[in-house]
Every structure is written in structure tokens, then in C-alpha cells.
């Protein structure tokens, strides 16, 4: 039997993980600058958590969820998105308590799972950065989080990212719009896709999110949510737009945008990149003021987003952005003879304890072969250990490029390698 990774998954080998680590480091720094704290939640949760959060009629629930019954008879699902888990953790751990500073700002970097047809930028196991800000409703919160995503793109050097913006209004506005949408779509019912016919009376906003050609043609002339906003929702959206303009963040209004999840209200947004002639959403989110209360927590306004890491990397590669820092090694220890093996092990550990990155030879090869390995690893310095060096305690530390070398002792290296390191690089520093 030939063992292979499951369809829709990917192995991340060292050359790839270096890119991931770079992006994660940048993202962690941006989130920290905005005072967000990391949260980690289980990869699997109760099926009901996700089905209730994302909506029984959503594609996630009806087509994409990985769910199963465990050995205890519990209905379990692999996490398809991060917000529901963050909200569950917020409630279960009583982060709504008065002694907890509001808003509660959380971020995560986690794998998600959806049973989709694998294609470019869409895997069955994929990874997202997510942020959730819970406890305050203020247009400035919405804009700060949108600005944070914009900052991350800029720090990564990603260009051509466009912000698409819409509002779903409050409950009163959505109710009025829902009826207007039903009235508009009903005459076209027989022309809609099977999924959209099913959703027409259950959740007509879902029809706007359809990717089927027949649905896209029909909703093109559908009424816009912006025409059904009450005064409160209008004023809130105007505040959001004004704050974005104050920060010089350009945006376009997409009145048909609804996002793929049921819990949103008021501000929703997507960051979109043109990729091979198609629009690719790399980040999306919005406000979800009713979700905490829906799960029996206290009324809690909230705002957040999810950002696809694989898509981010795909865009960066297309734009020829190199996320791989140059790999270097501080010291390579060339080892000659069995008697030097013990000393090489001790020396390598000593240097690592002094915060130097070290590799050594384990194969007792010829020196020429070891030096070639040092070259491939990008070693800056080489220490050669043979029987003579072990017997006398005298060694030479050689720069692999300039060939400059310093004679010293094993004892001195064990005590403090930093002065020796600095001596070798003294000419370059001066």
C-alpha cells in the first residue's frame, strides 16, 4: 500500500516552513502592536457549535463540515472557522466578567478544515490568522481592525490589495431587506439553482452569496441593503466610512456582499487581490453583535476577521516576494577521528548554550567533504577538531569566506566564544 497525504492537504517542508515562520513573526508583531493576545482552542468541537454559529443553511454546514460521532456517541466536527470557537471560549472562561478589561482582543493562528474540491488557494486543511475583538461597539473598533489587516499586508509587502466594504445593518434593517429580497427573487424561483431555491425563504441573503452562474445573473439587479437601512444603521456606516477616509484607507462599496456566515450584522468587509484575472478574497470579516448572546452568554458586541495564510503565500509568490531569510550557520565543527567525537559533542552544546547556531559532522568523513557541507549550510565559521586538537587543547577558528583565522583554546571557547567571534569579524566591523 502506497501511503500518501490525504487529498486537499499539504506537507510543509523546511523551505516552506521558513516562509510560514517569517509571516507568522510579522503577524504576531502587528497583532501585538494593536494589543491583541493569542488564544488557542481545540481543533474539534461540538458539531452544534459550528452548525448554530455558521447557520444551518450555510455551505459550511450543508456541504463542507468534517463531522463524525466519537466513541462516546458525541457529534463532533473539525473546526471549519475560528470565530465560533473563540466565542465559546469567551463564554466558558467568563471573559465577559466585569474585572476583565474590555474590549477583549484575541488573535489566533490555526488550521481549519472544510470538505471542498481542492484547487489553487483552496485546501481541505488550510490555515488562518484570526482576530476577535469582544465587548465594545464603536465604529472606531471596526476601522481599527480593518486597519490592522491593511497594516499586515503593507508590512509583508503585498500590493494590489483592495478593500471591499458593505453593511448588513441592524436586525430591523435586515428584516426589511429580507422581505424585499424575497419579493424580488420569488418571480425567478424556477430559474434559481437548487441551493438558492431551498434558501429563498429560509435565508434569502444566502442567494446573494451564490457562485452559480444562473443565480449571479438574477441577483445582479436585486435590491441593495443600503436602500433598507434605518437611520441608526446608516449613521453607523457613515462613521465607519469617515474613519477609513481619515486613515487614507481606500475602499469600494459592494452592496451585494453578505459574507458566507449567518452571524454578521452592520459592517462587513473583504480584502481582495486580482489573481490570474480573477478576484481572490484573502481576508474577510465583520461585526457579529448577537453571537455571544445566541450561545447563552451576555449581550456582547464583537468584530473580527479571518485571513487565509495559504492564499497569502500564493499571492506573495505571484508578486515575487521572497519571505525566506538567508539561512546561515554560526559555526560548523569538522570532526576527525573517534577521539574527537566526545569533545565535538561537548563543544557544540557549549556554543549553543552561548546562543550560537551550531552544526557538527557525525559521519567521520574526509575533511574536504565536511567543508563542502559547511558551505552548503552557510556556515560562517569552521572549527576543526582532530586528535591533535583534543590532546593539546589548541584550536583554530576560521572564517569560511575571508579565510581569516584565530588561534585559541578549547577552554577559552567553552568559557566565552563571543570575544573570539568579535575578533574574527573586527575588520568587517571597522
UniProtKB/Swiss-Prot annotation:
GO MF: ATP binding; catalytic activity, acting on a protein; histidine-tRNA ligase activity; transferase activity
Keywords annotated in UniProt: Aminoacyl-tRNA synthetase, ATP-binding, Cytoplasm, Ligase, Nucleotide-binding, Protein biosynthesis
A GO biological process this protein is involved in? histidyl-tRNA aminoacylation
Q: Could you tell me the EC number(s) of this protein?
A: 6.1.1.21
Q: Which reaction does it catalyse?
A: tRNA(His) + L-histidine + ATP = L-histidyl-tRNA(His) + AMP + diphosphate + H(+)
Keyword field contains Ribonucleoprotein = no
Q: Where in the cell is it found?
A: Cytoplasm
Among InterPro entries, the record links this protein to: aa-tRNA-synth_II (IPR006195), aa-tRNA-synth_II/BPL/LPL (IPR045864), Anticodon-bd (IPR004154), Anticodon-bd_dom_sf (IPR036621), His-tRNA-ligase (IPR015807), HisRS-like_core (IPR041715), HisRS/HisZ (IPR004516), HisRS_anticodon (IPR033656)
A GO cellular component annotation in the UniProt record: cytoplasm
Q: Which PANTHER family match?
A: HISTIDINE--TRNA LIGASE, MITOCHONDRIAL-RELATED (PTHR43707:SF1), HISTIDYL-TRNA SYNTHETASE (PTHR43707)
Family (UniProt): Belongs to the class-II aminoacyl-tRNA synthetase family.
How is this protein organized at the quaternary level? Homodimer.
The protein here is known as Histidine--tRNA ligase
Recorded source organism is Lactococcus lactis subsp. cremoris (strain SK11)
Q: Which gene encodes it?
A: hisS
